[in-house]
Amino acid sequence: MARKLAAGNWKMNGTGEHLAELENLAQGDLPEGVDVLICPPATLISRAADRAGDIAIGGQDCHAKTSGAHTGDLSADMLRDAGATYVIIGHSERRADHGEGDADVRAKTEAAQAAGLVAVVCIGETLEEREAGTTLEVVGAQLAGSLPDGVTAENTVVAYEPVWAIGTGKVPTLDQIAEVHDALRADLVARFGAAGKDLPLLYGGSVKPGNAAEIFGVSNVDGALVGGASLKAADFGPIIAALAAS
């Protein structure tokens, strides 16, 4: 059985003052049976790791190379040195804003794994692809192209985030989420065997305290990658509790 993971992606939000929200979350009554992850901006990783308690800290991206002339980029080794244990790779905002393709995501995932980080690999279809009826083909191809052969249930997490649901308040129906997650699970098992069965599959896209419980009741949903609702402990805490109760 896959472990449960509640992951928060702060994106480009937060300065040092915002770490009070992390401390509030860490000092609260976190339920057993759920791993909790916060991915703050890179400028906060070291300070966040010092204050996170049992909460894991991750980066939001890494370079595929370990070092070199790559101004503004961070290697997976650097993230690990700063205190990160996870890193998000291939988020749709990176794919869209920086032109990252599946081959780039695969190379970064390999780099993360080599550095000892858990890679949270993101995939998802656009609204046009959803309306064209090609969702399963699109996410299946992204999954195949983005994951290297060395994937295990310990070093990789897959997050399905329909691009049209991120930050829009729009959420797929539960049947639509189930269809995609069941297909992804089948693809993972076909390629990776037992590891594919136990690898956590997260849903992301406008997850909030009010809809988390029903989303976590969907088959093959092992947690969530949460954006805006992870910025405040008062919002993220109930999502974590809903996952624990699922």
UniProtKB/Swiss-Prot annotation:
It catalyses: D-glyceraldehyde 3-phosphate = dihydroxyacetone phosphate. Keywords: Cytoplasm, Gluconeogenesis, Glycolysis, Isomerase. One of its GO terms (cellular component) is cytosol. Pathway: Carbohydrate biosynthesis; gluconeogenesis; Carbohydrate degradation; glycolysis; D-glyceraldehyde 3-phosphate from glycerone phosphate: step 1/1. The keyword Nucleotide-binding does not apply. Substrate binds at residues 9-11, 167, 206, 227-228. It is found in: Cytoplasm. This is Triosephosphate isomerase. The keyword Cytoplasm applies. Involved in the gluconeogenesis. Catalyzes stereospecifically the conversion of dihydroxyacetone phosphate (DHAP) to D-glyceraldehyde-3-phosphate (G3P). Belongs to the triosephosphate isomerase family. The active site is at 91 (electrophile), 161 (proton acceptor). It comes from Ruegeria sp. (strain TM1040). The gene is tpiA. GO terms for molecular function: triose-phosphate isomerase activity. Homodimer. Pfam families: TIM. One of its GO terms (biological process) is gluconeogenesis. Its EC number is 5.3.1.1. SUPFAM superfamilies: Triosephosphate isomerase (TIM). PANTHER family: TRIOSEPHOSPHATE ISOMERASE.
